[in-house]
Amino acid sequence: MTKAHYIDFFKQAADKKIQWLKEELTKIRTGRPNPKIFDNLLIESYGQKMPLISLAQVTINPPREIIIKPFDPKSNTNAIYSEIQRANIGVQPVIDGEKIRVNFPQITQETRLENIKHVKKIIEQIYQELRVVRRDALQMIKKDNHNEDLENSLKAEIEKINKNYSNQLEEIQKDKEKELLTI
């Protein structure tokens, strides 16, 4: 295997972990409405499950409200409303004519601190998963019996990339904590 193969293996696996983390963090409610909270919502419509964005326009109405305007209000308003309630995401939708208003209540300081703990827990999970990926990459290198110089070079490169991912995780954590503490 080439040097690039080991590096690509590590980077692809680490990128998947970071992408998953970013998606998970969008699900954590902050003080402001975030339409991404509905990204994983699948609505039963036209005989199949469809993502909300393919059935409605989702817009933010500051300071703490999201407006959902179904493209086909007669067919989809009630289904969207029901699915938001069923999703148990801490918001209460209200049907207002042909649109749905979703108010995001002010979260308490206690909830903010609980969310920060949750963020730290998720980030620690990703750190652990990155360590496993790094270990797997290093074992692949060792198993393939390269000369010592190449092996050391590959290990150093993987450690350098791992440090970059660790720094990226620290930044993601700081940004999310700042967002959670902003009132």
UniProtKB/Swiss-Prot annotation:
CDD domains from the UniProt entry: RRF
Name of a matching Pfam family: RRF
Keywords: Cytoplasm, Protein biosynthesis
Protein localization: Cytoplasm
Gene3D superfamilies found in the cross-reference section: 3.30.1360.40, Ribosome-recycling factor
One term of GO molecular function: ribosomal large subunit binding
InterPro entries, sorted: Ribosome_recyc_fac (IPR002661), Ribosome_recyc_fac_dom (IPR023584), RRF_sf (IPR036191)
Domain of life: Bacteria
A GO-annotated cellular component: cytoplasm
UniProt xrefs under SUPFAM superfamilies: Ribosome recycling factor, RRF
Single GO BP term: translational termination
Role noted for this protein: Responsible for the release of ribosomes from messenger RNA at the termination of protein biosynthesis. May increase the efficiency of translation by recycling ribosomes from one round of translation to another.
Family note: Belongs to the RRF family.
Name of this chain's protein: Ribosome-recycling factor
